[in-house]
Design a protein with these regions (language model features):
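Ser/Thr/Pro/Gly-biased, low-complexity, turn-/loop-rich segments
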Residues: 1-178
Length: 178
């Protein structure tokens, strides 16, 4: 069975070599609200494994893609938390994040920083306790900041990685017949 937030939930006949990803593919994949990071395999009513498709897509890691057995249930959970990451990252997009993800792991999901990124100037727009938008400026290179706060992300946060400055300092322009 493939159930939960998938396009075509139901019972499927698969080959004995099929894995969780095969079952997800045959069911049409997750819906818009279906999680790509929390896909559970249940066998005889017990949780056996959780598949994170981001690991497959970004790292080619298939270690949690279990082979299916007769009577298994593949359950696609709903997305719990998403953040937007844009600016000087390789793959700007909206990403599903887990509660354990911080700003560094989210930027890693986005392919890492580009060569034009300024890691000392990352802006995180979040909602504070009073449901007001607040902007935090984060320096990813500051070791003290890393130690005291891992910059946990919340649902709806927006991360913007700013580019290095285009201005030059201490530059001498020489013109004319030199």
């Amino acid at each position: 069975y493939v159930v939960g937030d998938v396009q075509k939930p139901g019972a499927y006949q698969l080959s004995s070599l099929s894995t969780m990803t095969n079952a997800i593919f045959i069911s049409g994949g997750p819906t818009e609200v279906g999680s790509l990071r929390d896909i559970q395999l249940k066998r005889a009513g017990k949780h056996v494994s959780t598949l994170d498709l981001y690991k497959l897509f970004t790292q080619g890691d298939v270690t949690s893609d279990q082979r299916l057995q007769q009577g298994d249930v593949v359950f696609v959970n709903s997305v719990q938390s998403q953040v937007k990451i844009y600016g000087e990252v390789r793959r700007p997009a909206i990403y599903e994040v887990k509660s354990s993800d911080d700003i560094r792991s989210a930027i890693k999901l986005a392919g890492g920083l580009t060569s034009l990124a300024y890691p000392k100037n990352v802006l995180v727009t979040t909602l504070d306790e009073n449901y007001q938008r607040a902007v935090k400026r984060i320096d990813l290179t500051d070791k003290r900041q890393q130690a005291k706060n891992s910059h946990a992300l919340k649902a709806g946060d927006v991360v913007r990685v700013l580019p290095i400055s285009q201005q030059f300092s201490k530059v001498v322009h020489v013109g004319g017949a030199v």
